[in-house]
Amino acid sequence: MGSFRSSLFILVLHLLEGAQSNSLIQLNGNGYEGIVIAIDPNVPEDERLIQNIKDMVTKASPYLFEATEKRFYFKNVAILIPASWKAKPEYVKPKLETYKNADVVVTEPNPPENDGPYTEQMGNCGEKGEKIYFTPDFVAGKKVLQYGPQGRVFVHEWAHLRWGVFNEYNNEQKFYLSNKKEQPVICSAAIRGTNVLPQCQGGSCVTKPCRADRVTGLFQKECEFIPDPQQSEKASIMFAQSIDTVVEFCKEKNHNKEAPNDQNQKCNLRSTWEVIQDSEDFKKTTPMTTQPPAPTFSLLQIGQRIVCLVLDKSGSMTVGGRLKRLNQAGKLFLLQTVEQGAWVGMVAFDSAAYVKSELVQINSAAERDALARSLPTAASGGTSICSGLRSAFTVIKKKYPTDGSEIVLLTDGEDNTISACFPEVKQNGAIIHTVALGPSAAKELEELSQMTGGLQTYASDQAENNGLIDAFGALSSGNRAASQRSIQLESQGLTLQNNEWMNGTVVVDSTVGKDTLFLITLERKFLSPIPFFGVPSGRSQDSFLVGKHNKMAYFQVPGTAKVGMWKYSLQASSQTLTLTVSSRRSSATLPPVTVTSKMNKDTGKFPSPMVVYTKIHQGTLPILRAKVTALIESENGKTVTLELLDNGAGADATKNDGIYSRYFTAYDANGRYSVKVWALGGVNTPRRRAPPLWSGAMYIRGWIENGEIKWNPPRPDINKDDLQGKQVCFSRTASGGSFVASDVPKSPIPDLFPPCKITDLKAGIQGDNLINLTWTAPGDDYDHGRADRYIIRISTNILDLRDKFNDSVQVNTTDLIPKEANSEEVFVFKPEGIPFTNGTDLFIAVQAVDKTNLKSEISNIAQVSLFLPPEAPPETPPETPAPSLPCPEIQVNSTIPGIHILKIMWKWLGELQLSIA
């Protein structure tokens, strides 16, 4: 364990270039190291949970080893224990491990009894996931009947997380037609089982045979496929790892390419094993010839937060009022962002370093004010970043080890010697957050964040964008309880002329309101009167404290701010004003609405697009239909505004999961870009009753035991728009960090961006053998603008359509004019050039083309099956018995002929026709 902990920094340096990942996982030989499993602070203390986690991983490792043909196993795992749990000698202090970079989170179910394991996946096929979520009851083995053994489920979720594969089942469509037969959505197709219909009432279920609809040929929606307990087939883990004999992923030879599941839709019909083979992990390993060792574990307990500000006061900080803006942002951090109980120190540097404050524990406003008074007020000299860092290490070591401490480093200058202290940075184990101010900040600055797992941000000299305050506002601790974290409600700025006003509204919702702070920055002074704020009760609020030296005014709302709309009006002339509003959680039982944002990579090379993601949740519940806007600002000062969408199209991987996404293609220069998002929730903004388990192990509806089908209760239908009756109204802003662009050509920038891939193509039969297609329109440049035309092709062979798209039959699309990106497209056509008769399986794909003839990737492949229902049997008139013969009372059974038997036979024949159609 010791050698792993000491080598953690070296491992972090080998993260994939450009990947925006907080994870510390590394593949060392064939073993995964640096896995962090965090117990959420809301989980009640229970030491057994730690042993349960160990048992789960220990059982998962050999299963992973076998499933990957002796390539991978779990080597060591860090278990992150909440600060509120009782300390023990075996619990050590974390180094770089935090809740932010945890790979697995064990948290309470929300809502109760919703113990489904799942993995949050923002990206597309082959892209790593974000986190795995388990509940304490699941880890304890109390949900084996519902999901299977914990170790096997962990491997299923690990494949989502590490290799970006998807599920091979489909809760929304469990059967499909192929060659006139109903087929279950399974992988591999060789899995044997029974198709049955459970009819449940109360706690008991009756099993009945599935029946096909006479019009569609499909089984009832409630039908289930129950696998046989004994199978000869060994795949697939992404379908049902709960089957005892399933020990492999689906491979190309046994992959069910026709099954309508996420793996086929998102991965272009490739098997999970093919995707895994394309991963960097697979490419740099060879199978082991010996059995792997059992995993080892380190127990880490979160301690007090220790932060040292390292602030540039060199001569260049006088440019554009940078030092004044530093004071304003630093004051926000010290007065509001940093949590009560944290230890904070401060170092300023130019060509040398100066200790402005030793570590001070924040217990009251007095410590906050004293630290704020220590902020540097004069700028001169050169820039020596290493001097500032070394001084910060010394300040921290006077009271605590540097492991797990944090340094906030702000600089605006170049420093060619910054790499000289990289070895000391690795050795000291502090997490370094970097703030690059202006266009000339040291180019190596981001390396410090990347090697230590810190946040990297960039603030331009455009004061009205409020970038510096946003950067400091993003530095709330992710390791503290949710009630202590600062939440930013508003961040606005405007340059006013001729006594103009800046007016607006801030929503204080019921999940926040504690420690609410309104902060205004200015360049000179306010015109009379002082800023006006109208509180929801209708009264005005003008009790602002005005700082003369750092040009700011602020108002701390006493107690809990009143829920409602807070209106503001600020007046000035020929100067820039900014407004920042932050608050904290108001209720111990009601989770706050939180907004987090990130880019898919921290470096972008033209013409590769970037993707901006924003996650909006209340606890673990996703917030839907919010209005989310991203502002992306380059070093040139150009700002691009993007509307982010949760529509399951373009850059957005999954619809209605509370993750809003959009491609960014509007490069205008090389260098740094900052990212900021606004999120607004109004009367049409609901939340789900439960998180969508899109990438989770399959819920076991039933199983066969001693020849009899046993049933679990129906799983709550949480993937539907099952929404709370209470709407969610809120306003939030958040920093998405920064990224660095390269290879951007000089203006005019050529059009090298094709339309994005269509990922939600759906097809159905309409009327007289017509096919109805729907999809979300791509754009001219990925998901922006309007495509020029569509190419639609069809085939009766799914692989021919995928691999020989240009040779497949083309549909006439003369009358199909593309709509604006993200609009719904509908197109109806009659197949020509291919016989379309009863039982025909037809596969359809679409390709978008832009005005410069750049083509998108081929869409997901949609399928329709032409099913002509059999003619209904003619009604047989009842026989009239001869009047002279009495009609005896009879029981209907298989030995007595007559009208009853005839009706039964007709019914049976009809069912037989449907079952073999």
UniProtKB/Swiss-Prot annotation:
Active-site residues (renumbered): E157
EC number: 3.4.-.-
Organism, scientific name: Sus scrofa (Pig)
Positions glycosylated per UniProt: N503, N772, N806, N812, N838, N893
Secretion signal span: 1-21
Entry keywords, A to Z: Autocatalytic cleavage, Calcium, Calcium transport, Chloride, Glycoprotein, Hydrolase, Ion transport, Metal-binding, Metalloprotease, Protease, Secreted, Signal, Transport, Zinc
Native organism taxonomy: Eukaryota, Metazoa, Chordata, Craniata, Vertebrata
UniProt-annotated stretches for the region Metalloprotease domain: 46-199
Keyword Iron: no
Family to which this protein belongs: Belongs to the CLCR family.
InterPro entries: CLCA_chordata (IPR004727), CLCA_N (IPR013642), CLCR (IPR051266), Ig-like_fold (IPR013783), VWF_A (IPR002035), vWFA_dom_sf (IPR036465)
Matching NCBIfam families: choice_anch_X, hCaCC
PTM info: Glycosylated.
Function: May be involved in mediating calcium-activated chloride conductance. May play critical roles in goblet cell metaplasia, mucus hypersecretion, cystic fibrosis and AHR. May be involved in the regulation of mucus production and/or secretion by goblet cells. Involved in the regulation of tissue inflammation in the innate immune response. May play a role as a tumor suppressor. Induces MUC5AC. Induces a cAMP-dependent chloride conductance possibly through effects on CFTR in colon carcinoma cells.
Site positions per UniProt: Cleavage: G696, A697
Gene that encodes the chain: CLCA1
GO MF annotation list: intracellularly calcium-gated chloride channel activity; metal ion binding; metallopeptidase activity
Name of the featured protein: Calcium-activated chloride channel regulator 1
Domain notes: The metalloprotease region is responsible for autoproteolytic processing. It can also cross-cleave other CLCA substrates.
Subcellular location: Secreted, Extracellular space
Record-level GO cellular component terms: extracellular region; plasma membrane
Residues annotated as domain VWFA: 306-475
Gene3D superfamilies noted in UniProt: Immunoglobulins, von Willebrand factor, type A domain
Organ and tissue specificity: Expressed in ileum, trachea, and the major salivary glands. In ileum, expressed to the crypt and villus epithelia, whereas in trachea expressed in both surface epithelium and submucosal glands.
